Amino acid sequence: MTESLDAERMACWRAYIESSQRLFTRLEDDLRADSDLSFADYHVLVLLSEAPGQRRRMGELADRLVFSPSRLTYQVATMRKRGLVAKEACPADRRGSEAVLTAAGLLALREAAPHHLRSVRAHLIDDLDDAEVACLTRVFERLGRRLRADRTASSTPADK
């Protein structure tokens, strides 16, 4: 049987779960009110805007978003209907495809970004001092590295 968490660690876990859900919901609500973009829409647009040529392979984009391939396909399809992204064959490998940021998608991102930044500041960043920002950055970067490594290890066939 798995050992239970002590009271301090249980309080940490529960505080994280509730606050992260509330934060995500608030950021999502603010984004939709200010821009008619979902959080997933916004994240796709950001990742494409930062990529060389404003395009990414679908598999890489799914990995960065922590989406299943089918979820990303659906997400990109809904964004294509709204003209925010295009889907094109990968120039280097015609079997693969890439999501590509459109001019309309870039405009939507540029219009939404200041509102989203205000929301992030209001609901998270401005409530933290410099030491707390540094601590959270260390904790979540370490956690992200470990979870990415765990995911990579679990998706790689074991050597026989």
Segments (PLM) and residue ranges:
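Charged, amphipathic alpha-helical coiled-coil/dimerization segments
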Residues: 77-135
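Exposed, interaction-prone assembly regions rather than primary DNA-binding/catalytic cores
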Residues: 132-160
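N-terminal helix-turn-helix DNA-binding core of bacterial DNA-binding proteins
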Residues: 25-68
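A cross-family signal for key residues in well-ordered alpha-helices
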Residues: 14, 46, 110, 137
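Short, hydrophobic-biased segments on the C-terminal half of alpha helices
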Residues: 58, 76-77
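N-terminal leader segment of winged-helix/HTH proteins
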Residues: 1-35, 130, 134, 160
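Alpha-helical linker/hinge and terminal dimerization helices associated
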Residues: 23, 27, 65, 108-127, ...
